[in-house]
Amino acid sequence: MSSQPLTLQTMMAAILNFWSEQGCIIHQGYDLEVGAGTFNPATFLQSLGPEPFRTAYIEPSRRPQDGRYGQHPNRLQKYHQLQVILKPVPENFLSLYLESLKVIGLNLVDHDIRFVHDDWENPTIGAWGLGWEVWLNGMEITQLTYFQAVGSKPLDAISGEITYGVERIAMYLQKKNSVYDVMWNDSLTYGDITQYAEQAWSQYNFETANTTMWLKHFDDFSAEALATLDQGLPLPAYDFVIKASHAFNMLDSRGVISVTERTRYIAKIRQLARAAADKYVAWRESLGFPLLKTPPSTPTVTPKKIPTICQPEDFLLEIGSEELPATFVPTGIQQLESLAKKLLADHGIAYKHLEVLGTPRRLALCIEGLSHVTIRPESEKKGPPLSLLFMTDGSVSPQGEQFFSSHGLSISHRSALDQPSAIWRVRSINGTDYLFLVIPEERKETAAILVNELPQLIRSIRFPQKMTWDNGGVEYARPIRWLVALYGDQILPISLGFVSSGNTSWGHRQLDNRQLTIPSSNMYVDTLRSACVIVSQKERRAIIKQGLQNLTGDQIVAIAPEHLIDETVFLTEHPFVISAQFDPAFCSLPKELLIAEMIQHQRYFPTQNMQGEITNRFLIVCDNSPTDSIVEGNEKALAPRLTDGNFLFKQDLLTPLSSFVEKLKSVTYFESLGSLADKTSRLKLHLEEAYALLPLCAKEDIDTAIHYCKADLVSSVVNEFPELQGIMGRYYLQNASLSRAAALAIGEHLQHITLGSSISTTGALLSILDRIDNLLSCFILGLLPTSSHDPYALRRQSLEILTLLYTTQSSVDIEDLFARLIRHFPSSIPNTVWSPEAVLSKLNTFVWGRLRTILSSLGFDKEVIATVLTDNCPKNPLTIIQSAQSIQELKNTQILKTIAAMYNRLKKILASLSFSVTEQMFSLQSAEDLLFKQALDRFVEETTALPISSKDYLHLLKELAQSTELFLDSVRVASDDESTRNQRIALLIAAQKCFGFYAWGVL
C-alpha cells in the first residue's frame, strides 16, 4: 500500500480509469432513487439480449431501512456503489478485478483476500446470479456475480457484474474506523458532506414519511409503468418500475407492510420488471441488435491422439475452477468419488485405491494403480436345442430362421454346424444337443474409455446450484478454467466446452499464483504443495484444529462448531490460524448475539473462559501468511458488526414488549390460520385445556411465557438473526423484570430437545404446547412430510414432544390430548377441507411411528418394541417406555417366558372355539372354575392401583398365567355341557383381556 492513501474521490477516479482502459463506457449514476447499482438501466437493460456491452459508473444507492441516524460506522441509508458490467464476461474476470485493486494501492500479498459464496438475488426485479462476496481481511468490499437471469429472463450472453463498496474500501485504505472520518478530498470528510443528511433522512424514513402518499405513489407508478408499456416505450416504463420499487422500500422502512403484503408488493414489481424486460428485448431485436457486431463463438474440438498406456499407472483428473462455494466442495468430492467408482465398475476397470481431494479452486480425482486395459474373457451363451432349430431333413426350421437372423448368422443347413467355427459350438446336455454362441474376448484400452466418458462424468456432478458462464454449453458450480488429465505422465485429451485438458495446474491465488506443470500423476500432491496449495482436506482440517488448540489454553477455549471448521477447511488452500481482539465493552452484549455475529457473518471462532463467559479474543482462519494488516483488518471488520448488533439490541430494549406483542398481529403464521397473534391466543386455549393434565410448573409462569413467547420474532435482532428467536426473548423479558421462569422458558422453547437435554419445567410445558400446535396446524393444512422432505421439521418436533413427556415423567394419554387441543382450531379454514377425525387419525399414526424411533434410540430390543407398540397398548408414551424398560430387564427370565407361553396358548384355544358368549359369568359349578375365577378377581384387585409398566405388575401377570395353566390342565374347556362350556370360555376371555395390552407372543 502506498504511504499516502487515496482520498475517496481519487480512489473512485482510479478505479473508473482502470475500467475505462479495459474498454468500459463510463456512465453516470442514474437520476432516480435506486436500491442498488443493478437497477441502473446500464445494468438491468443492457444485460438483456445478445449485444455486448461494457460499462462502469458510480451509483448513489438508497436503502431507507439501512439508515442508522448517522451513528453507525458503515451502515447508511444512502451509499455509493461502483458498478462494472462486462458482457460477455471475459475469462480473466477475477484477474481483472484483482488488478483493479492494485491501482488503488493494495498490495495483495499483504492481505487475506477471500472469495466467499454468494448466491446473489434481487427478487424485486427478477435478477439472480452466482458468484462471491470478496472479503479483504474479513471485510466485505465487493460483490462479483455471473448474472444468470435479469427481469426473470434467462440471459443470452452472461454478464459479469462487479460491485465495489467504495466507502468500505476507502475506510480500509485510510485506516478509519468510521465512514464519516473518510477523507472525501484533501480537506473535507465524508461526514462533512453526508452525516447531517443521514440523520435527517433516517428520521424521515423511519418516523415521518407520509405512508398514505407513498402507498398512492406505488399504485400510481405501477399503473404508469403498465400504461407506458402499452404504448411500446420500455425505457420510460422501466423508470416507473424503479420509482415503484423505491416507494415500496419507503413503505417497508416505515413498517406498514406485513409479511404477506410484502410478498405481494415484490411480486407486483417483479411482474412489471419482466414486462419491461420483454419489451426492451423485442425493441432491440426490431432494430437488429445494432451493438452485435460479430456472432458469439462456439467450441470447436480438434481430435487428438490418445496415448498408449502399456501398464497400470496412477491417474489424475483435476477440475480447476474459480472459487467453489465452501459448502459445495464436500458435495463435489462425494459426487466425483461415487461417479468415478461407478464408471470403473461399469467397465470392469481394476485399480488399487481411489481418493478425491478438494479445495476452493479444484476437485482432484486420484486413482492409484489404474489398470491400462479392461478385458472381458471369452464366454458362451446357451441357445435352443438343435431339434428346434432344424427340421428332420437338416433344413432350418421357422424358429431357427428367426434365431439365426436375430444373431446375424448365415446358416442354411444342419451340416454347417459340423464345420469348426469361432462363433458357435454344439454341446450335449443330458443327451440333447444345444447350440452355444461364442462371445469372443473383448479388450478395451482404459485411456480410450476415460477420454470418452470423463466429460460426461464432469457434467453429471450435481451441486445445489449450477451456472453457465459462456457459450460452451457447460454447467458447473463456478466457471471451469483448466483441466488436468494425466495417466502416469501422459496427457489424456479431453475437452469440456472451451477448455481442453493438459498437464498444467495453478498454485495458490495469493501465495504463489503461477502455472504449474504436473510431471506425472503421482507427483500431483507434492507439486501443488510446492506452490503453497495443501490439496488434502484432511491435512487442512488437522492444521486448523491444531491452530485453534495452540492459540487457546487451559483458561480459554475456542467455540468451534463442526460446521464452521468444515467451512474454513473449504475456504482455504493453505490455512493459517491467527488471534485478534475486539473492544471488551462488547462482551456485555448477549453471548449468543456475539457468537452469531462472529460465526455467521465473519466465520470467526469466538472464545470463552472456563465459566462459559465470552472473551474479547477471537480466532481467524486466513488463507495467506499472517501479517499485522490482516489482524488489524479483521479487527476493523468485526467492530462495525458488533456495533450494529449493539445498536439493534439497545433499540429492542427500548421497545416495550407490549409493542412487540401488538406487532404479531401483522406477522403471518400460516396464511390460512392467521397471524402469530392468533397462534399465541390458541396456545393460551391449549394451556387452559392441558394444564390439569400436565401441571408441570406454576400457572402464573407459564401464562407469562405463552403471552410473550413469540414477541421477539418482530425484534430487530431476530430480524437480522432468525436463529436467535426465543433466545433474545429471554433477554427482553429479563430486561422488563418479568418472571425469571417465564424468561428462561422462552429462551428454551425453540431449542432442539434430545434425551440428554436439560430444560426447565416451564420451558418443557411451553415447548410441548408449541410443538403440538405446529403439528396440528400442519396436519390440518395437509403439510405432511414425505419420505425425503420435511420442511416444517414435523418428525423432529414429534420426537421432541415424546422426549419431553418422558424426561418430565408426564403421564398423559397423548391421543386424548391431541383430541382436546384440536378443538381450538376453526372448523372452517379458507382453502382447506378438513375433519378432526381424519387429521387425528393421521397424526396419531405419525406420532406412534416416532415413539418407535425413541424406543430404538433408548436401546430396547426389536422384540421388546414390537411387544409394547400394539393397537391395544396404552396411549400414554411414558407408560409405553416404562413398560419397555421393565420387559427389557426381565427378558429371557422365566417370568416373561411364562407370560408369553400363556398368551399364545389362550390365543390359540380361543381361536379354535366357536362361541358367542362374553365374559359374563354364569353360575359356576366346579371347584376348578371357582378357583380360577378367584385368581382372576385377585389379579384385578391387586393391579387396580398398580401401573401396568411396573415389574410388580408383570410378576402378578405371571402368577395369573400359572393359575390359568393350572385351570386349563385341570378342566376340559369344550365341555359337552353347554352351560359349563360357556362359563369356561367366558373365564378365558376375561383372562385374555388381562394379557391384552401387549403382544406377548413376539417375545
Curated annotation (Swiss-Prot):
Its EC number is 6.1.1.14. GO terms for cellular component: cytosol. SUPFAM superfamilies: Class II aaRS and biotin synthetases. Residues 1-310 are annotated as: Glycine--tRNA ligase alpha subunit. It is an enzyme of class 6 (ligase). It is found in: Cytoplasm. Its main location: cytoplasm. Residues 311-1003 are annotated as: Glycine--tRNA ligase beta subunit. One of its GO terms (biological process) is arginyl-tRNA aminoacylation. It comes from the Bacteria. GO terms for molecular function: arginine-tRNA ligase activity; ATP binding; glycine-tRNA ligase activity. InterPro entries: aa-tRNA-synth_II/BPL/LPL (IPR045864), DALR_anticod-bd (IPR008909), Gly-tRNA-synth_bsu (IPR015944), Gly-tRNA-synth_heterodimer (IPR006194), Gly-tRNA_ligase_asu (IPR002310). Keywords: Aminoacyl-tRNA synthetase, ATP-binding, Cytoplasm, Ligase, Nucleotide-binding, Protein biosynthesis. It catalyses: tRNA(Gly) + glycine + ATP = glycyl-tRNA(Gly) + AMP + diphosphate. HAMAP family: Gly_tRNA_synth_alpha, Gly_tRNA_synth_beta. Belongs to the class-II aminoacyl-tRNA synthetase family. This is Glycine--tRNA ligase.
